[in-house]
Amino acid sequence: SFVERSLENARRAKAKEDWEECEKYYNMVEQYEPTNIEAIFYFSYGKARMALVDSDRFKREQKIKVLKNSISVIDDNYDSSPKKYEENKALIQRINSDLLAFLNSSFVMNTTTEYGKNGSYTTNDSEYTYDMFVELSLGMIESIEHIIHTIPDKYKTTYLWKIIRQQYAYIYSVCRKTSYRHNYKNKRQWLDSINRVDEKLKQLDPNYLEADLEELPRTTNEVNAIIAAAIVIIMIIVLVIYYISQSM
């Protein structure tokens, strides 16, 4: 059928990361099947992917807002009938995986040179994009929580709770960035959320072992700060040893 051919073309385009073609074919599918979750998500996903290389932050915000809206209606169009469970599970897991790949992608940022008492320093507007990313992650969490409530067999929601856990872990990783100072910087809040999800997963699966929260690589500023602190400590130790030797 036309829809099946369009889906095949869209998936091939996505596999090749041809986001313009991906957007085009998923748009065709959505026109014929307005409740098709795959088409709803990936049509806006392709747009958002292209926005990452656009230096205009406001255009990026517009495209990411469309993706956020698409995520928010995943649960509205979710078919909770038992016969669709495995198909839906595979699709939701794929969407989550691709969303996490998007959230961890590089993106164009604008830099500015500013001047202070200690000379010049460079800043960038990456925090605004990270705000957008966190909002996507929160939108995914909300949509998944709504889907969980539609599944009678709670043991079949285990994979959905794991998705929620992954999204909270992503938000926590943003908070740990030294450069991030914006709206979602309360690390304790996200750690508490992760712990609550871990407890839920242990109830559903006694063999569940929570994944370690990966430490982010240290930034250049963090490394420089550690080196500077180490030098100061070494100098203090040397001075103490010197004064002790002089007093003997």
Model regions and ranges:
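Residue-level recognition of tetratricopeptide repeat
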Residues: F2, T35-N36, K154-T158
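Alpha-helical segment of the N-proximal tetratricopeptide repeat
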Residues: F2-Y32
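Short coil/turn linking the two alpha-helices of tandem helical-hairpin repeats
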Residues: R11, S44-S55, L100-E127, Y172-S179
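Alpha-solenoid helical repeat scaffolds
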Residues: N27, E38-F43, R57-K59, K68, L138, E142-E145
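Juxtamembrane boundary at the C-terminal end of a transmembrane helix
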Residues: V238-M248
